[in-house]
Amino acid sequence: GSSFVREDKTVENGKRSKYPCNWELQGFGEYTYGRWYTIKGERPSDETGIYRYKFESPATTSGERIKIFFDGVMTDTEVFINGKPAGEMHQGGFYRFSYDITDLLKPGKKNLLEVKIAKESANKSINAAERKADWWLYGGIYRPVWLEVVPAVHMRHFILNADQHGKLQAAIEMEGDAKGYELSVSVRSLKDGKDIYTQENKSSISHQIKDSNKEQLVEGNWMNIQPWSTEDPICT
């Protein structure tokens, strides 16, 4: 577990806390129902807490990077490694975010992770979307946190858009100097794992990266697609 402390307490007085778990379930803070705004004079609870956890950094080879991923934190989140900020504050409780912490780590030594969380967002639009709702409001790290070792050049983010006729578009953002690298996209059957061929009778399509700072768009058309549907579900 990690240690946890409310902002109005000293870190030395922190208590052991399990995660992933919203902090109300462990006796910190209080629940407020999401329709608090319908009650005159009512305000939602807005605690701030700090998680502290010591860990050893994973081994890496030359050029590899270490990233820390948060699958879900409610709500505004600041991350510090050995007392230094990992990046800008993340706002929004329902989606994953990450930081490259390679240069902040002490290889072979204990490293300190501190996560400062404000239950209520400083962003009004986020509060309107996430906190004015028909559910209980909560705070804390409620989804898993993990480290990943990645190559110096890797995919940072991608979006796939496939239609029932076999057309596929892949929008890919790269991390690192990827100029001259080649991206390859292939499609396999869920039933037997075999390659599905394009209309040009190729098992994959390739894309040469000319500018790694730009989004890479890869497009292709595949034959004999059997799209999943409720009428014709494909079980794996």
Stretch-by-stretch model annotation:
Residues 81, 167-203, 207:
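Beta-strand-rich binding/interaction modules
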Residues 2-4, 198-199, 232-236:
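Short, intrinsically disordered, charge-balanced linker/junction segments flanking boundaries
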Residues 94-98, 215, 226-227:
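Short, surface-exposed beta-strand/beta-hairpin micro-motifs centered on an aromatic residue
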Residues 1, 22, 41-42, 46-157, ...:
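Accessory beta-strand-rich segments of carbohydrate-active enzymes
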Residues 200-224:
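Intrinsically disordered, low-complexity Pro/Gly/Ser/Thr-rich segments with frequent PxxP/GP/PP motifs
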Residues 1-28:
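Predominantly extracellular/luminal regions of secreted and cell-surface proteins
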Residues 160-166:
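Short, solvent-exposed loop/linker segments at the N-terminal edge
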Residues 61-64, 105-110, 217-235:
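Short glycine/proline/serine/threonine-rich loop/turn segments at secondary-structure transition edges
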